[in-house]
């Protein structure tokens, strides 16, 4: 096989430098229409349903944004799935005194996986605070039991790497 500079450059641009924490997201609503998996989040019920071929295959209890930091509503396409992510406090007032958490750290609020869904800082991810599940406790992200977040991410990857995400009040 011959080395193809253009392909390698494209791969590097898509993935980013190793360890950069960069992610790629198409943001394409047309991609959402083609996604074989649909995730439906009810903020009031605090649950995430996974729908495949028109049928609910699994329902997870989740934590959602608190009233002061609500989870955005609408239709989204999930983007990059990052395994074993680090956590860098976002440049927001609530995170001003928080510290960087490396991958695998017990205090890392992302835990084993994060699934991007809305710019700039909204994810579906595991949690280091499982008691928050079923509550309005996050700063807008959708928190899951870590093992369930990993199972969801694997399901999305098997289905092509993206899903339609519908979040309703």
Give the residues covered by each predicted segment.
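Secretory targeting signals
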Residues: 1-3
């Amino acid at each position: 096989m011959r080395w193809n500079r253009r392909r390698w450059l494209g791969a590097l641009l898509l993935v980013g430098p190793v360890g950069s924490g960069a992610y790629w997201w198409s943001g394409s609503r047309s991609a959402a229409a083609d996604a074989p998996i649909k995730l439906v989040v009810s903020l009031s019920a605090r649950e995430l349903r996974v729908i495949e071929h028109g049928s609910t295959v699994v329902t997870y209890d989740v934590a959602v944004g608190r009233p002061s930091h609500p989870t955005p509503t609408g239709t989204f396409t999930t983007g990059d799935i990052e395994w074993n992510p680090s956590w860098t406090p976002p440049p927001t007032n609530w995170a001003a005194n928080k510290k960087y958490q490396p991958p695998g750290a017990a205090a890392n609020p992302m835990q084993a996986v994060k699934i991007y869904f809305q710019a700039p800082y909204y994810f579906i991810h595991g949690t280091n605070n499982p008691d928050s599940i079923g509550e309005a406790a996050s700063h807008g992200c959708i928190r899951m039991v870590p093992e369930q977040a990993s199972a969801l991410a694997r399901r999305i990857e098997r289905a092509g790497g993206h899903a339609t995400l519908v979040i309703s009040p």
